[in-house]
Amino acid sequence: MSKPSDHIKRPMNAFMVWSRGQRRKMAQENPKMHNSEISKRLGAEWKLLSEAEKRPYIDEAKRLRAQHMKEHPDYKYRPRRKPKNLLKKDRYVFPLPYLGETDPLKAAGLPVGATDSLLSSPEKARAFLPPTSAPYSLLDPSQFSSSAIQKMTEVPHTLATGTLPYASTLGYQNGAFGSLSCPSQHTHTHPSPTNPGYVVPCNCTAWSASSLQPPVAYILFPGMTKTGIDPYSSAHATAM
């Protein structure tokens, strides 16, 4: 960038007066050293100088400043403005997507201050939520009594065989996975294992003694079938 012909340089300060000769000397001693590294070293050396060593350069800087004011009485320092960075222009590097009018509170046309009152009152906020088709219901902790908790603990959380993709293909309907099936059509609810505040409907019967057996993994080798294999007797024979 070319400077205008009428550009007036600033008067040198004490450090610039001292570093003018030192920079030339250091550049001759280290021709491959970058100019920024030279400036860094000169600044460190200038800080190590005592006030008595800096005094001649301070006086020279004052003389140059007075001379500069005489030559340019209307001089005013105007720093060059750096071009604005394009990244700073966009404050959000990853802008949030616009969700449109899908927000129930926004679609209802509520004022800005009304959302605070809705957050403090869950009953009012629940009225703006869209209806859901999920068969789960939120239970209030005050509704749980000792008898209700005992009844819910007696009801197991079982999995249907259809939810296990490998159970039917391996043919273990009557094995460990078969004990997890729901043969009865009696509908009841039990607490969700992931969220105790929800109940999940299930067509399951109560736990039986056979369903408490842990699942056993079978490893079938060529020429072997799963019939006739007793895992407990095999494990006992191996341990012996």
From Swiss-Prot:
Tell me if Nucleus is a UniProt keyword of this record: yes
Query: Chief localization class?
Result: nucleus
User: Which InterPro entries does the record match to this protein?
Assistant: HMG_box_dom (IPR009071), HMG_box_dom_sf (IPR036910), SOX_fam (IPR022097), SRY-related_HMG-box_TF-like (IPR050140)
Q: Which UniProt keywords apply?
A: DNA-binding, Nucleus, Repressor, Transcription, Transcription regulation
Question: Where in the chain is the DNA-binding region found?
Answer: 8-76
**Location in or out of the cell:** Nucleus
Q: In which tissues is it expressed?
A: Highly expressed in developing brain and spinal cord.
Name of this protein:
Transcription factor SOX-14
Q: Mind giving the lineage of the organism this protein is from?
A: Eukaryota, Metazoa, Chordata, Craniata, Vertebrata
